Amino acid sequence: MSSRNNNKLPSNLPQLQNLIKRDPPAYVEEFLQQYNHYKSNVEIFKLQPNKPSKELAELVMFMAQISHCYPEHLSNFPQELKDLLSYNHTVLDPDLRMTFCKALILLRNKNLINPSSLLELFFELLRCHDKLLRKTLYTHIVTDIKNINAKHKNNKVNIVLQNFMYTMLRDSNATAAKISLDVMIELYRRNIWNDAKTVNVITTACFSKVTKILVAALTFFLGKDEEEKQDSDSESEDEGPTARDLLVQYATGKKSSKNKKKLEKAMKVLTKHKKKKKPEVFNFSAIHLIHDPQDFAEKLLKQLESSKERFEVKMMLMNLISRLVGIHELFLFNFYPFVQRFLQPHQREVTKILLFAAQASHHLVPPEIIQSLLMTVANNFVTDKNSGEVMTVGINAIKEITARCPLAMTEELLQDLAQYKTHKDKNVMMSARTLIQLFRTLNPQMLQKKFRGKPTEASIEARVQEYGELDAKDYIPGAEILEVENEEENAEGDEDGWESASLSDEADSDGEWVDVHHSSDEEQKEISEKLNSMPLEERKAKAAAVSTSRVLSQEDFQKIRMAQMRKELDAAPGKAQKRKYIEIDSDEERRGELLSLRDIERLHKKPKSDKETRLATAMAGKTDRKEFVRKKTKMNPFSSSTNKEKKKQKNFMMMRYSHNVRSKNKRSFREKQLALRDALLKKRKRMK
C-alpha cells in the first residue's frame, strides 16, 4: 500500500521532477498544480517569514530543477526568489535561507539569471550571521566569476562587480568587507582579475580600521599568504603520476640496478615538473600595478606613525613601505628617522628592521639622509662591547645599504669597518671582508691601499657617479671583444654577406663535422693583451662602431657578458696576474629586487649551542625513539599479510609435508651421534 502511495505524482516531487525532465509537455497539468501550490505557500510565508517551512523549501527546489522546462510559466520565478531573500534575509530561518540560495545558484548555473544582480544580492547576504551560508556564497562567487571570464575577459560584468566590491570594502559590516576582500585576492591569485584596478581597490583596504582586513591586505602585498591549502580543487595535482605511484611500480617490479636508476631518474623528472608548475609568489607583481605609489606610501607612513596596532602589524606596515620605496625609488625622507628609533641590538625583531632599512635605500635618496642611518647602525651594533653575532649583523646591514646607496658611505667610517678584517671572531672578520670586497668594485679609492687588493681591469675602469648622475652610454660596454674575435673572419668574408651565409649553410648541411671555436687560456690571454694595449677612448670608439654596424645575436651578448666578467679577475695592464684564468659559470645568481633576511643574518661560522640546548635536543630524540626492533612499514596499512608472515604462524602439522620442509638440509647420522655423546657427557658431569 505504501509503494502505491509513493507513486502518486502530486505527493512525490522527485518522481514528478524526473518525469517532467524527460517529457515536459506530457506533465503540464501536474506542474501547474504544484506551481499553484507553491504560490499559496509563498503567500503564507509572507505573513510569517521567520517561521520554518519544509514544504516551501521542497517546492522551491522543485521549481528550480524544472525551471528550464517551462520558461514561459517560470519567467518571474527567479526575481520572486531574489525579492523574498533581499526583503527577509535577516529574519529567515537559516535552513530555508540556505535552500533559497541553493535554488538561485542552480538557476544561475542554468543561465536563467543575470550574474550582476545575483552576485550583488549574494554580497549583501554576506552580512548574515551564518558561517555555512557565507562559505557557500564565497565559493559560488569565486567560481561564477571564474566561469564568466573563462573564454574571454567579460569587462562589462567585471567593471560592475569591481565597483560594487569597492563599496563593499567600506561597508560597516566587517565580516562582509573581509569576505569581499578575500574574493578579490582569490580572483587575483587565479589570474582572473589581475588588472591594476583590482590592485588599487585592494590598496584601500590597507587603511581599514578593522585589523583583520588590514592584515589581509598587507599580507597580499607582502606575498606572505597563509599556508598553501592542498585542496582537491587544484587541477595540477591530478595530472601525471605521483611519487607514490613510482615507488609502488618499483616495489612490485624486478629489483635490479637498472630499474633503480630508472626510478631515480623518474623521481628527478617528477620533482622538476612540480617545480615548473609551482606558481610564483602571486602578489609581488601587485606592487608594480599601484597607480600612485608615492601617495600610497605617504599615507601608510602617516598611519604607521599614529598606529596603535600590535607590533606584528606595525612590522608588516614597515615592510610594505620599505618595499614600495625600494622598488619604485620613492622619496620618503621621514621613514628613515622613524626606522632609526628601533635600531637597537635589544630591540625585538631587529634583524627584520635592518632588512627594511636596507630595502628602503636606493641611489636617488640624498646621501646625507642615509649617512645618519649608517652611523646609527655602526654606533649601536659595530662596537666591541657587543657580541660577535650583533657586530656581524650590523656590518651585513651596512654592506646591503651601501650596495644600494654607495655615496652614503664616508671614508672615515669605511676605514674603521675595514679594520675588523683581522678581528678574532670569524663571523665579524668575514663580514668585514665582504664589505671590503664590495668597495673594491664600487669605489676602490675610498679604501686604504693595503685593502684595495690587486687592481683588475674592472677596478681601473670603475668610476663613482655623483648624486643624480646618469651614466647613459651610446654603445654596448664590452662590444669591442667581438671585433677582436671576428677580425679575421670579417677580413676573409665575401662582400655579399647573404651569399657567404648561404654558402656556409650548404657546406654545413653535408653532414660533416663543424669546427666550433673554443676559447682556451692562451686565446683569452691573447685577446686581453690586444685590448689592454689599446687606450680606453679607442676601445669605446670600437665598441660604438660594433654596436651600430651589426645586429648582435644572443651568442654575441653572451660573449660580451663573459668578457665583462673576466675583467673582475684579469689583472690590470702592467700588473702581475693574481691567479690563472678560471672559467666563470654563466648562470651566476643575480641580485633581485628584494633582499632576504639571510643576507642580514648571514653567519659564516655556526655558533656553539649551550648545554641546555644540547640536552633538550637529546631528550627530544629519546621521546620519539621506538623499540630497538626493525619493523617493516607497509605502504598500505590495511593490506593483507604476506605468505612469509602466514608461514611463521601456521601449525607445524600443516607444514609437515610441504616441499620446503621435506627438502630441508638435515643433520647426518654422524652429526647426531656426536651431539648425543656430548649431551651424555654433559649430563654425567652435572650428576657428579
Swiss-Prot record:
<dbReference type="Pfam" id="PF21638">
    <property type="entry name" value="SDA1_C"/>
</dbReference>
<protein>
    <recommendedName>
        <fullName>Protein SDA1 homolog</fullName>
    </recommendedName>
</protein>
<feature type="modified residue" description="Phosphoserine">
    <location>
        <position position="232"/>
    </location>
</feature>
<keyword id="KW-0597">Phosphoprotein</keyword>
<feature type="coiled-coil region">
    <location>
        <begin position="254"/>
        <end position="318"/>
    </location>
</feature>
<comment type="function">
    <text>Required for 60S pre-ribosomal subunits export to the cytoplasm.</text>
</comment>
<feature type="modified residue" description="Phosphoserine">
    <location>
        <position position="586"/>
    </location>
</feature>
<dbReference type="GO" id="GO:0005730">
    <property type="term" value="C:nucleolus"/>
</dbReference>
<dbReference type="InterPro" id="IPR016024">
    <property type="entry name" value="ARM-type_fold"/>
</dbReference>
<dbReference type="GO" id="GO:0000055">
    <property type="term" value="P:ribosomal large subunit export from nucleus"/>
</dbReference>
<dbReference type="InterPro" id="IPR007949">
    <property type="entry name" value="SDA1_MD"/>
</dbReference>
<keyword id="KW-0690">Ribosome biogenesis</keyword>
<feature type="compositionally biased region" description="Basic and acidic residues">
    <location>
        <begin position="514"/>
        <end position="524"/>
    </location>
</feature>
<feature type="compositionally biased region" description="Basic and acidic residues">
    <location>
        <begin position="668"/>
        <end position="681"/>
    </location>
</feature>
<keyword id="KW-0539">Nucleus</keyword>
<keyword id="KW-0175">Coiled coil</keyword>
<feature type="modified residue" description="Phosphoserine">
    <location>
        <position position="236"/>
    </location>
</feature>
<feature type="region of interest" description="Disordered">
    <location>
        <begin position="484"/>
        <end position="524"/>
    </location>
</feature>
<keyword id="KW-0813">Transport</keyword>
<feature type="modified residue" description="Phosphoserine">
    <location>
        <position position="596"/>
    </location>
</feature>
<feature type="modified residue" description="Phosphoserine">
    <location>
        <position position="234"/>
    </location>
</feature>
<dbReference type="GO" id="GO:0042273">
    <property type="term" value="P:ribosomal large subunit biogenesis"/>
</dbReference>
<comment type="similarity">
    <text>Belongs to the SDA1 family.</text>
</comment>
<feature type="region of interest" description="Disordered">
    <location>
        <begin position="605"/>
        <end position="688"/>
    </location>
</feature>
<dbReference type="Pfam" id="PF05285">
    <property type="entry name" value="SDA1_dom"/>
</dbReference>
<dbReference type="GO" id="GO:0015031">
    <property type="term" value="P:protein transport"/>
</dbReference>
<dbReference type="Pfam" id="PF08158">
    <property type="entry name" value="SDA1_HEAT"/>
</dbReference>
<feature type="compositionally biased region" description="Acidic residues">
    <location>
        <begin position="484"/>
        <end position="498"/>
    </location>
</feature>
<keyword id="KW-0653">Protein transport</keyword>
<dbReference type="InterPro" id="IPR048292">
    <property type="entry name" value="SDA1_C"/>
</dbReference>
<dbReference type="InterPro" id="IPR012977">
    <property type="entry name" value="SDA1_N"/>
</dbReference>
<dbReference type="InterPro" id="IPR027312">
    <property type="entry name" value="Sda1"/>
</dbReference>
